Amino acid sequence: VGVALTRIPQRPTDAAPPSPAPETSYIAAGSLTGRTILVDPGHGGYDGGARCRDSGVWEKEVNLAVALAVEKSLTRRGATVLMTRRTDTDLCDDTTRPANVTKKRQDMQCRVDMAVQGQADMVLSIHMNEYRVRSESGPQVFYRAGSGAGRLLAGTMQEALITALSPQKERAAMPGDYFI
């Protein structure tokens, strides 16, 4: 399981700035009222992602199922949840894609655009990675490098995943700079 957390810093210039909140507000056990979270089930449509060698299930299918469950959980806690997809589709539009832009690049840019346009406070990009050696597999949460709030939330999520899944390999939350 891979989850990338990104705090979206851009807001339209005509929007009022959000009220300041302590970094721990994202991980408080209480309400998420007033927070907008974009949930991105990775891959979709033409892009299946990794495929399980044992079952033949595509990553895009598992990502979507997990994302829909995450949406329900976040909504129950009061968050406004935006979804990049709810079905097996990608975000490409071949009729408007410039010739020098790959389908994958347009799909990823559309995901970023949805977060910015939706004024998301956070992005959860959900992936199920494949490891050739089973003992290396396990959940891992990534956050934007330099984000204190992201680091705190990612650490909390990483601990919860380890507790819930009891993986052979206990990974740590890691910083990164990802283009979803």
Identify the function of each model-found stretch.
Residues 1-180:
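Catalytic-site microenvironment of enzymes
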